[in-house]
């Protein structure tokens, strides 16, 4: 610091010019970096700002045309998609309505068929179509049909048992009925023949062996 103070003003200016010349020489040595905008110093030794990048006008115009074409293509796609969405939006309510109508018609046919079947079932079940009985519900009709079927099954089972019992009894009684009666048996049951002519009451009483006429009611009556 003492040496710098001892220097005069002219000496200080000469020293500053020598530093500036040294800076120019250094900038010339860094030529490639200077062309890239890093090296050259101004008259006061300051480095200049980096030059702004320049894009060719043809490139700018081509990019503008491309962006315009892309915008038009995007607009066409948007319009096409919008028209398709609008058509789908108009078509969807019609399809939904037709589908709903078909489902309702199918359900209506199913209920009609079910009601017809239940009416036919009520017609063959006793106590279900009497004038004093109101129309049974679906569940009541099915329960009554179930009970009626069970009752018929029990009746058929009892009938089978009865038929089997009768067939077994006929098998046991057949030999007894087939045995012929002996003459003694015939006399014991019917002592006179079919060709014997019966006379008055005393004569009829006399035809029986061992039967006195006093026991005959007609013979004991007075005339």
Swiss-Prot record:
GO terms for molecular function: DNA binding; protein dimerization activity. PROSITE patterns: BHLH. Residues 32-93 are annotated as: Disordered. It is found in: Nucleus. One of its GO terms (biological process) is post-embryonic eye morphogenesis. It comes from the Eukaryota. Its main location: nucleus. SMART domains: HLH. It holds the Pfam family HLH. Disruption phenotype: Disrupted rod signaling and profound retinal dysfunction. Residues 98-152 form the bHLH domain. CDD domains: bHLH_TS_bHLHe22_bHLHb5 (cd18954). GO terms for cellular component: nucleus. Keywords: DNA-binding, Nucleus, Transcription, Transcription regulation. Expressed in brain and retina. May function as transcriptional repressor. May modulate the expression of genes required for the differentiation and/or maintenance of pancreatic and neuronal cell types. May be important for rod bipolar cell maturation. PANTHER family: BASIC HELIX-LOOP-HELIX PROTEIN NEUROGENIN-RELATED, CLASS E BASIC HELIX-LOOP-HELIX PROTEIN 23. This is Class E basic helix-loop-helix protein 23.
């Amino acid at each position: 610091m003492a040496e710098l103070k001892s220097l005069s003003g002219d000496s200080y200016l000469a020293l500053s010019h020598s530093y500036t010349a040294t800076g120019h020489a250094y900038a010339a040595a860094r030529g490639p970096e200077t062309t890239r905008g890093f090296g050259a110093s101004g008259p006061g030794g300051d480095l200049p700002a980096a030059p702004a990048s320049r894009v060719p006008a043809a490139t700018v115009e081509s990019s503008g045309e491309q962006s315009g074409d892309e915008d038009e293509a995007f607009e066409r796609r948007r319009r096409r998609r919008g028209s398709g969405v609008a058509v789908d939006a108009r078509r969807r309510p019609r399809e939904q309505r037709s589908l709903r109508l078909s489902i309702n018609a199918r359900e209506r046919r199913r209920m009609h068929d079910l009601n017809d079947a239940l009416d036919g079932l009520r017609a063959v079940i006793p106590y279900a179509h009497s004038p004093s009985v109101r129309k049974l519900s679906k569940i009541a009709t099915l329960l009554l049909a179930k009970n009626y079927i069970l009752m018929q099954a029990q009746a058929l089972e009892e009938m089978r048992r009865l038929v089997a019992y009768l067939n077994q009894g006929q098998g046991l009684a057949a030999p007894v009925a087939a045995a012929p009666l002996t003459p003694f048996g015939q006399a014991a049951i019917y002592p006179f023949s079919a060709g014997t002519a019966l006379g008055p009451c005393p004569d009829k009483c006399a035809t029986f062996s061992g039967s006195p006429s006093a026991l005959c009611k007609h013979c004991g009556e007075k005339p």
